[in-house]
Amino acid sequence: LDNALSFSVLAPLLDRYRLIAVDLSGQGFSDHRSPDATYHIWDDIPQLLAVIDEMRLDRLAVLGHSRGAAIAVLLAAALEDRCSQLVLLDGMLPRAVADEEAPAQFLQAQRDHQRLAKHRPRVFADVDEFVKARVRLGFSDQSARILAPRALRRGASGLALVHDPRLNHASAVKMSPAMCAAFYAALNTPTLTLMAEQGLRQQGELESAIQALSGIPDCDLRTVPGSHHAHMEEGAEAIAGHIVNFIA
């Protein structure tokens, strides 16, 4: 999974701003949640609001990628007027679940939870082996190496993945299409959405994603060349340019 280093390529290109990147719960160097806790996207909001208050940030722009973009939508809604701008990088609210699909979604979450007792973290001999495994999942060599320092922990048998495996599980409850549309419509902050042409949503899915995001009242919606991790790769400079022009 991604971690705070996902923004390490963009950060120098956005050096006119104070960029604060966090490892969300269960990712990177952040703690895993307790055994009885969940990783629904709304579970991160109280923690992030607490961080913002602790840092005494009266007003801020919110930037999120992938799952972080879904969380960013909810965070912007919770911040209300304290959110000056919202930037979504190849991410949005998760695919909605129709009412009739809710029981199947719930059952999948229970099956995932039952398998947790047998889970053992993946262990790699070295960083190169980790990178090869990530490349098979669609990462570039560059993006995998960028994430590695906060994705792995050295143990007696090698380098183990540190993220909480529950982050890969199905959520017991997901938003309906109407709920997603309502959250988009309720956003009262200028929003920049950059969807990668070879990202998470491609071809027909990209068209439906754009249609859903068009429900945001003040949304500058663009497609950019590259993959899901374009902001860590060859597309970083162009993406940074879009962000600077938007926030300026």
What are these regions (language model features)?
Residues 224-236:
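Catalytic histidine-centered segment of alpha/beta-hydrolase-like enzymes
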Residues 6-8, 30-36, 97-100, 204-205:
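Conserved catalytic-core motifs of eukaryotic protein kinase domains, centered on the activation segment
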Residues 186-227:
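Conserved loop-alpha-helix segment in the C-terminal half of the alpha/beta-hydrolase fold
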Residues 57-102:
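Conserved hydrolase catalytic core segment
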